[in-house]
Curated annotation (Swiss-Prot):
Subcellular location: Cytoplasm
Keywords assigned by UniProt, alphabetized: ATP-binding, Chaperone, Cytoplasm, Nucleotide-binding, Stress response
PANTHER family membership: HEAT SHOCK PROTEIN 90 FAMILY MEMBER
InterPro entries xrefs: HATPase_C_sf, HSP90_C, Hsp90_fam, Hsp90_N, Ribosomal_Su5_D2-typ_SF
Pfam family, one: HSP90
Biological function: Molecular chaperone. Has ATPase activity.
GO CC, one annotated term: cytoplasm
Coiled-coil regions, chain positions: none
Assembly description: Homodimer.
An example molecular function term from Gene Ontology annotations: unfolded protein binding
Region named A: 1-336
Primary localization: cytoplasm
The name this protein goes by in its record: Chaperone protein HtpG
Length: 629
């Protein structure tokens, strides 16, 4: 055992052995659990910040505290040529016993077993089983072969100590003369990690992970962190300019946010948050589900960034929300890279979801134009929640907005507004689905409703067909697609044209059935058509044609359902066909016209697959028509 000189007295250099499980633990940390070497700096800064917080607290009551008036700060010294790094704080420091307890032993029994399990399963751990083990310090061995820690406790008569280890099985402790309170960590970087001695790289890491810690972080005389954690301040103290700049920083957006929400919660769980609504949705958010799965606000613990995009903070349909959530209540796993599935996390998520939905409701009532901008950008994503978040389903339904036959293009109506202006005789909420507003308004199925002034919701968002049918009813009024054959058509039509007599119409219907026996379920007289000769509708229990088309586009086709062809008995074409049958029931033109009308109905709704045959047949009919003149 060697010795050192301290105040003229020989003090032995003490060597200690790590326990077997500590050695295995170090190996796991260095080689398995930390996926990014830069994390080491975040961990050391976080530990320094904790030590400074304790020093600040003790200064309130301990009048004899060592260096009571010293600035509470973290100082970095880099030497790129020597590949060395020094991290020093003026925090609470450590005694010899604390050095052994904090740096020489496992923080909690059973740690190694949990760590090995984490490595094998690569999954989050239950917050009830694993706490904060405090082993983040050892991440420094990812970037160095040996680390030296010099420390002196805050007690006025405290002795200084030097702790040194290569992480290989032993560590040493010796007494030293250290004039100031706090801890100094120094080491030389491995060859492959010398980038961490470059000022630009260290500044980059500090701004990414530790920009908002409570204490200044100096590199030389230059402060690297802003320390301005806006989410910690009351909303009344926030200025739009600084909020906008902060949003651009956390969201990597060049635009100002559409709106923001400041949250402060105290109770069973405590946290603060500053959340933002972007003005626009990135295109990839609409077309790639994985984009939503991997998004979320930033998660901080004690102002230290733990997870840049924390998907566990919000349900999937709200993950377009940017911002920061900061709590001191959350249990973390050892590497701080994954948040544990804990009751605390679940509670934070529940509270955040409720407050965000309340925020949307407030915008809808108090700032409708701002809400409309938000809904146009993120409405399709919000609708996803109807099929996933059953707890908040009613709130989400109230947020839904639709264009309708009574709104201008780009304007919306809510389900509640729709119900309030329904006629007393109307029992159902009607909707029509398709590719765009113009197509929907031109569709034959809507003619009856427009003639009688019955409002129809126009669903042109692809998401609608997956979520709207699941609502079933609103305010005790069933939602009904106007494509269904069993809609209520009890109001008298103002169409003055005389319908074809039943004895003449029945042969027409029969001729259509024979011509289209393989394509349609039935051919019936229509009560909905006003100006079109035919239309296609679905049976009571059949799926909508729009949903069927979308399933095909997604390569998940459903068994094709036969449709019902409705025929307008007052239309001139139908009257002419009746005359053709009376003249010659075997006229081949009858079947040709029947098929052309059927495929024309398919064309109008976007379901026609063989456009070539349709156009060829149309040309033949035009040729026949022109020959008779």
């Amino acid at each position: 055992m060697s010795s050192t000189e301290n105040n003229g007295t020989a003090v032995p250099l003490q060597e200690f052995e790590y326990k077997a499980e500590m050695k295995q633990l170090l190996d796991l940390i260095i080689h398995s659990l930390y996926t990014h070497p830069e994390i080491y700096l975040r961990e050391l800064i976080s530990n320094a910040s904790d030590a400074l917080s304790k020093a600040r607290f003790n200064a309130l009551t301990d009048q004899d505290m060592l260096d009571k008036d010293a600035e509470l700060a973290i100082r970095l010294t880099l030497n790129a040529e020597e590949k060395s790094v020094v991290i020093e704080d003026s925090g609470i420091g450590m005694t010899e016993e604390e050095l052994i307890a904090n740096l020489g032993t496992v923080a909690k029994s059973g740690t190694l077993g949990f760590m090995q399990s984490l490595k094998e399963q690569q999954q989050q751990l239950d917050g009830n089983l694993i706490g904060q083990f405090g082993v983040g310090f050892y991440s420094v061995f990812m970037v160095t072969e040996e680390v030296t820690v010099e420390t002196r406790s805050f007690h006025s008569n405290a002795q200084g100590y030097r702790w040194r280890s290569s992480g290989q099985g032993t560590y040493t402790i010796e007494q030293i003369d250290k004039a100031t309170r706090g801890t100094r960590i120094s080491f030389k970087l491995k060859e492959e990690h010398q980038e961490f001695a470059e000022e630009y790289r260290v500044e980059q890491i500090i701004k990414k992970y530790s920009n908002f810690v409570d204490f200044p972080i100096y590199l030389g005389e230059r402060q690297l962190n802003s320390m301005t954690a806006l989410w910690q301040r009351p909303k009344s103290e926030l200025k739009d300019e600084e909020v906008n700049e902060f949003y651009k920083f956390v969201a990597s957006d060049f635009n100002d946010p559409l709106d923001y929400l400041s949250i402060s919660v105290e109770g069973m769980v405590s946290f603060k948050a500053l959340l933002f609504l972007p003005k626009e949705a990135p295109p990839e958010l609409m077309y790639r589900q994985s984009e939503l799965e991997n998004r979320g606000p930033q998660l901080y613990v004690k102002k230290v960034l733990i997870q840049n995009e924390c998907r566990d903070l919000l349900p999937e349909y709200l993950r377009f929300i940017a911002g920061v959530v900061d709590t001191e209540d959350l249990s973390l796993n050892v590497s701080r890279e994954m948040v544990q599935s804990s009751p605390v996390m679940a509670k934070i998520r529940q509270i955040l979801t409720g407050k965000i939905l309340g925020w949307f409701e407030m915008l809808a009532k108090e700032q409708p134009e701002k809400f409309k901008t938000f809904y146009k950008a993120f409405g399709p994503i919000i609708k996803i929640g109807l099929n996933t978040d059953f707890t908040n389903r009613e709130k989400l339904i109230e947020l839904l907005r639709f264009e309708s036959t009574k709104t201008e293009e780009g304007e919306f109506v809510t389900l509640r507004e729709y119900v309030e202006r329904m006629g007393s005789e109307q029992k159902e909420i009607y909707y029509h689905s398709g590719n765009n507003r113009a197509q929907l308004l031109a569709h034959p199925n809507i003619e009856y409703f427009r003639e009688h002034g019955i409002e129809v919701l126009l669903l042109s968002d692809p998401v609608d067909m997956f979520v709207i049918p699941s609502i079933h009813e609103f305010d005790k009024k069933p939602l009904k697609s106007i494509e269904k054959a069993d809609c209520d058509f009890s109001q008298q039509s103002s169409n003055k044209a005389e319908p074809v007599a039943p004895n003449l119409l029945n042969p027409v219907l029969q001729a259509f059935k024979e011509a289209l026996s393989n394509e349609v379920e039935d051919v019936v007289e229509s009560r909905r058509l006003v100006s079109s000769p035919v239309t296609l509708v679905s049976g009571k229990d059949a799926i909508d044609s729009q949903l069927e088309r979308m399933m095909k586009m997604m390569n998940t086709p459903m068994p094709p359902a036969k449709r019902i062809l409705e025929v307008n008995s007052s239309h001139p074409i139908v009257r002419n066909i009746a005359g053709m049958i009376m003249a010659d029931a075997n006229n081949p033109l009858i079947k040709t016209v029947a098929r052309q009308l059927y495929e024309g109905a398919l064309f109008l709704e976007g379901s026609l697959e063989d456009a070539t045959s349709y156009v060829t047949r149309m040309n033949e009919l035009i040729e026949a028509a022109t020959l008779t003149r």
